[in-house]
Amino acid sequence: MSEIALTVSLLSLVAVIGLWIGHIKVRGVSLGIGGVLFGGILVSHFMTQYGVKLDGHTLHFIQEFGLILFVYTIGIQVGPGFFASLRQSGLKLNAFAVMIVGISGILVILLHKIFDVPLPVILGIFSGAVTNTPSLGAGQQILTELGGESITAVMGMGYAIAYPFGIIGILLAMWLIRIIFKINVDKEADEFDSATNNKKDGLSTMNVRITNPNLNGLMLQEFPDFELHEVVYSRIKRNDELFVPKVHTQIQIGDILHLVGTKTALHKMQLILGEEVNVSLSTKGTMYRTERAVVTNEKVFGKQIRQLMLKGKYDVVISRLNRAGVELVPNGQMTLQFGDVLNLVGRQEDIEAVMAIIGNAQQKLQQVQMLPIFIGVGLGVLLGSIPIYLPGFPVALKLGLAGGPLVVALILARIGSIKKLYWFMPPSANLALREIGIVLFLAVVGWKAGGNFLNTLLSNDGLAWIGYGAIITFVPLIVTGLVARIYGKLNYLSLCGLLAGSMTDPPALAFANGIKEGNGAAALSYATVYPLVMFCRIILPQILAILLWVAG
């Protein structure tokens, strides 16, 4: 059997066993995708006994490529909501994440001083305990710069010992917090969805009768602050006639307007217009219809809604715009992106004409544009390879193969499309690539750790190393988790994403995502803290190495 065939076969075996382990539940809790790591350790242990070895370069490529796929698809998934999240709760989340990083750094110093743990060992344990491979590389580089090249190899051993238990510690922290606070996951998910919809311009409707005499005879576009209130006038009822208003429609006293917008904007507009009334303005039984259409025509990507001149040509109004699950109030300045879902109100023939303009080709939503994926991955790898020089540091910092693709994916997902290129990915395709990536990554990590795992575990102070790693992993997580839940009132699912992101741990994120399928809280908080945490995790071992090396 060729080297490639042997590698693929054994990693497939690792994936099968690991995924099976991950499905085993103990009191309703399972390792999930993290089981692949232990599948790798198990298979590697027995294969080593028979002298089976795999090519290191091949394994390294598979591991890094899997990680790139995982973080890139995560960025594409959460990108549309990431920047809004920064404005809403990002400061709090990042503060807690930095708290976790800071506590772990303090613990490294204490363990090094109290138990006289060699510097290369404690730095390796630190990197494994926080499940951060770039941290290991940064620590090895700085030790080499400081003249310790001959002892950096031991860092890898400390990393391998601490890494598996680093993942367990994160899952254990999530589980204990769930037990301590008697968390109802469904309730937490509902609260997150409700709060997120409110924060992200979740839309409501209101019917208002015009009673303000100052508005009589005015056109809609002449209303005070017409564009600033972020309200859509989707229907108007005059006597018994229902029709779709246009910007030049003249308003009369007694007209009833159907408004769409945020609750705050609706209330402000109601104070200007008149009184709220409980009157039906349904399109049922009339010549008007309400339809949902998807933007798929590349000719309208990046165009402002007003450039389509729908209100001038057609008896149609766009009452809502849904982008990546977030409902927005459409206005003339808003640009259209691939996958935007528009709520159209108007005559059937006019709605059909508008659908023809924007595309509404549902099958395109299931198609994957491969070119943007490889452009994004390539740009991400380039960004991760750019050295960042800071005064006083002998080694250039880098985002690496994990941080670079993530940052690029977040930006591209936020942009949405550039001419004919769009970075929308069907959820099924995104999930498939993400799961394949994390399985490849974990299978290789488990294989590398499993060969001499038991020997290392039972010798060379292996048990003590495990203890140090467990402290570095667990204490910052549980302390910050308790503080965030009690004083920060953080949603449990968001907290799980925070814990996973603070350790830059994809398996923990996969576990957190599995706590409540289909809820994006964990992924969103993970992506919110990941860029800053990755930067801190790369810098911290260098700072620790310099401080502890100088201190002797």
Swiss-Prot record:
Kindly list the residue ranges recorded as spanning the membrane: 4-24, 28-48, 65-85, 95-115, 157-177, 370-390, 393-413, 438-458, 463-483, 492-512, 532-552
Record's SUPFAM superfamilies? Answer: TrkA C-terminal domain-like (SSF116726)
| Entry similarity comment | Belongs to the AAE transporter (TC 2.A.81) family. YidE subfamily.
Checking PROSITE patterns in the record gives:
RCK_C
Cellular location(s): Cell membrane
Q: Known InterPro entries for this protein?
A: AAE_transporter, RCK_C, RCK_C_sf, Transpt_YidE_put, YidE_YbjL
Pfam families cross-referenced by the UniProt entry: Asp-Al_Ex (PF06826), TrkA_C (PF02080)
Annotated source species: Glaesserella parasuis serovar 5 (strain SH0165) (Haemophilus parasuis)
According to its UniProt entry, one GO biological process term is:
potassium ion transport
Which protein is depicted? Putative transport protein HAPS_0158
